[in-house]
Structure formats: C-alpha cells, structure tokens
Amino acid sequence: MDADRLAELQLTRAEMRRIGEALQDRRFRELLTEYVEEISSPENRRRYEEEIRRLEEERGAAVQFIHPTPHHVLKGRGPSGKCFINICSDQLIEKPRSEAATDDRGRSGHSWRIPYSLTPGRAGRDAAGAPCVLFDAVFHPDALLMAENNARFMTLIHRTATGGIQDNFRIRLEHVTRLKMMKYKGEPQPTMIRRPNPGQTEAADRGPQQTTGPQQPTGPQQPTDPQQPTDTQQPTDPQQTTGPQQTTGPQQTTGPHQPTDPQQTTGPQQPTDPQQPTGPHQPTDPQQTTDPPPTAPQYRLKYRSVLDLQDYRCCRDSGSAGRPTAIIIEVEVPRLRSAQEAELRVEERRLLLEAPTAEYRLELPLAYPVEEERAEAQFNHTHRLLTVTLPVLKRRRVEEEERRAEEEESRKGGDEDGELHPDCGPDPPMMELQTEDTHTPAADTHTPAADTHTPAADTHTPAAETGAGLGSGVALLSSSNVISVCGADVHQQLEEPGDPSAHTDPADTHPADTDPADTDPAHTDPADTDPADTDPAHTDPAHTDPEMESRIAGLHLQNTLCFQLD
C-alpha cells in the first residue's frame, strides 16, 4: 500500500535522489520531526483555528470549527467507485425540531426539521487499498440518540444524509448499507462553518472598498447632499463604488445620520436609473437569481418485448417480433423529495415531466404510440428514481388491412367494367343476339310501294341487307376486346366482295327493263308504279340464295363461339 501511495506522487529520479540525500542528514530529520509534532499538537491546532477565526471576523463572517464525533458508517457505490458516509455528531449543530402537520390524505403527524452539516468528498482507501471517496454528515447528538431508539427515525437520518450528498454534490449513490462494526472511515478532520456576521456585511468588508468609505469627508455635509453633491456623486456610479458606499453609510454613522441615509439612497437612485446604464441592469439580476431555468434530468430508455412463437410463423397474420410491448423510462431526480412534487403528462407520442420545486423539466418524444390510460409511474425514495412504464399500442390486424385492400380492388375493378365502348351499348344476353340476327321473312319482304318498279332498285343484294343486320348484332356484343375483334372480322367478311353486282342474281336482272332514265329518282313517276309489275321472286320468303344462307349461318356460329369463349 505504501508503494502505491509513493507511485501516486510521480517523482522523478532526480527528486528521489535528493530526498534520499536529505533523509541522510541528521539536521533535516530533526526539523521534519518538529514539523510533524507541531501540526499534530492539539494546542497548535487550537491556535491555528483561533487565527483563522479572527481573520474571518475581520472580513465580516463568523466561523465555527466542528470536530465530528464518530457514530456509524454507511457504505454505498457512486459513479467513481465506493463511497463511505461517516455519520457523526457535534454540539454546534442545531437540535432537530418537529411541528404538527397533516399529509395529503388528512392523517395527522409530525413534520421534522433536522439540521446537518456535510463535508465535500475527499480521497481515501478501503481495506483492500482501492481508492474510495469519504463524506462526513454531522448531526446534533440528540438526533442520533433518537435514531438509536427509533428505527424509523434512523431511516430518516440516513435518507437525509444520502439525499443531501446527492443534491449538493450532484452524484448518485446506490446500494447504501450500514456497516455495524465501523464507527468512522479514515481520519477525523475538523469542519469549518462560515456564516455572515450580523454586525457587518461581506460587501462592505472587501479590500479596495473598505478604504473608500471612511475617507469620504462628506460625513457632516450629508444633509446638503440631495441639493448639490448629487452631481459629484453621479460620475462615481459607473465605477460601482456607490453600491458599497451606500451600505457603509448606515453602519458607520449609526446615531445622528440615520434619518438622512434614506434620503441619500432614494434621492440619487431615482433620477440616475433612467439616465445611467446601471439602472436597467439592476432589475435583471434578481430575475436571474429567482427564476433559474429548469434542468433536464438524466434518463434511460428501455424497450420491453414479450417472446411469442406465434410471431415467427410463416403466415401473413403473424405479428412482428421487432415491435416492443412496452416502453420503460427511468428518470434520475435526486432533488425530488416525493412524487407529489412532480407532474407527469403522457400523450400518444410524447412524455412531459415537470417538477417546479426541484427545477426539473423533461420533454421526451416517443418512437411508438402508447396507451395513455394504462401508463404507470413508480417513485423510489431511496434511490430518487422515477420509473414510467408505457404500454405500446398493438399493430392493426392483418385481416382488416386485407379486407380494406379487397374493397379498394373491387372498387377499382367496378370502375373499369363500367366503362363502355363508344360504339357499343350495354352487353345483351346471348338470346338477344340470336333473336336480333334471326331474319324473319317480314324483315326481308319488300313492299310494293318501296320497290317503285325500277330494275336498278330491285338489285338489292341480300348480302348487304344481311351485313347490316349482323353489324347491329355484333355491336351489341362488343363489350370486350375479343367480341370487338370478332365484330371486325364479321364486317371484313361481309365487305370482302366490294362489288355489289357480284351478289346480284342473274335471274332477277332484266336487261330489257334497264332504262337509264328510270334510274334517276327525279324522273320517277308514281303513276308508273304498278302492283302487277312487282317481281314475285322478291316477295316470296322461300326465294333466297343458298350460298348467302350458308355464309350467314357460318357468321352466326362464329359470333356465338366468340361470346362463349369470352
């Protein structure tokens, strides 16, 4: 252990050699021994404390030295390693006091006020020689006496000591336990408590400002200050010398000049505030001290998931294993006394924690939507840790998504089926096609009035009439691409000859009856129309060309097959 302490000094070879040579000198050893006895002597320590006390009193502060009496030790773990808290007592600490009070539930009890003193952490070593940190918490002896007889009061003493160290030194202590076989860790050291002196102020006792106060010769001329000397005092205001001079006035001229001091302070301050730049800066200082901005506490974010083998199936309805079931947030709030001092708001995508008394504010966005109604919060008084558990909303079921997708597909499909061909109407059934294309004898029968006894007009080919009839039937079935193609084939087959004379029956054509004059509609005389001259071959339904009937039957069969295949 001594070798480790020597290594911490980081001495060079030259320094080690010089120390070795000095220790060989007898005179050096005598001086070193005398110095050790001097600093360890109680009388010298008392003299040293008295000198420090006088020096602080001259500066306007009352100093008290506390010599802690060991009682027991608490052991914990901090951010840098082991920590030991020495619970001590001293008569200079105030006694604990209690007052009758009621809690939020209306239960009556006592509210305790326990004064204590803390020392900053100092380096030390544990039993194994590892580095550690030592703290001292000093209470009044009556407080420790009550704690020995009451376990709840002892717990209150421990919480007060650990909470004060965490709040004042900004560290976190974990796993704090009591060591029963140890009263003090390390070497007891006196503690100095410095309080302001009631008779003086610290601002008036500063070095360069103490000399300016007594040197002013304006003491007896103070009643005339509000009229003339205000002009001479204004240039001294930017030098920040009027602040301590005004405070030293009532301290030095206590008796007769007290009624004139308020006039001096209120007189020059009111006209100089709007003129000099020192005025607007004065109200900003108390705002900065009274309203400090809240700090964001440290937190840890965790995601909790429940392992389920159903989530790993090769199915579309299996859940996603990467989505957590809950979000856990651990917030460190060492300055928070109880959970009632904090306000927690949970939204679907945001968490907000506000503690005005402890000056905490934390706004945290959430990666997953959570259920606000099922949120839980738990506060650990020992570790000053706030744990918030937020259940994550489950993902939408796959069945609902599939149903919605099917509805959208069916809606789109209905829109596409509703679009009709510009040349076609709605799709008729197959029976309507057969009845439409079936040529009755009455449809092909030419009335005598329409024949007008002209041989040229009698040359109406059955193919042209049949093509017109089939064209209308095909147009009714052109609701799809296949039927439209079939309809185009029908028209192409009907229009292939291109020469109307090719379908003219030689038996129906009379060359002798052909007259160029008769072919002109303008020269047609109604009187020339004779019912007896009507060709009986045109009015006979049985008089039909066999070749055209076979072609019409083939076209009917082709249209029927195209409709059934579609």
From Swiss-Prot:
- What GO biological process terms does the UniProt entry carry, in alphabetical order? axonemal dynein complex assembly; cilium-dependent cell motility; epithelial cilium movement involved in extracellular fluid movement
Pfam families with a match to the protein in the record: PIH1, PIH1_CS
| Chief location of this protein within or outside the cell | cytoplasm
Work out whether the entry's keyword set contains DNA repair.
Answer: no
Q: Does the keyword Nuclease apply?
A: no
The protein's UniProt keywords, in alphabetical order, are: Cytoplasm
Name its cellular compartments: Cytoplasm; Dynein axonemal particle
The segment annotated Disordered runs over 183-298, 399-467, 493-552
Taxonomic superkingdom: Eukaryota
Q: Where is the composition biased (Basic and acidic residues)?
A: 399-424, 535-550
The Gene Ontology CC terms held by the record are: cytoplasm; dynein axonemal particle; extracellular region
Bias-annotated ranges (Low complexity)? 208-290, 440-467
Q: Which family does it belong to?
A: Belongs to the PIH1 family. Kintoun subfamily.
Q: What does this protein do?
A: Required for cytoplasmic pre-assembly of axonemal dyneins, thereby playing a central role in motility in cilia and flagella. Involved in pre-assembly of dynein arm complexes in the cytoplasm before intraflagellar transport loads them for the ciliary compartment.
Protein name as annotated:
Protein kintoun
User: Which species?
Assistant: Danio rerio
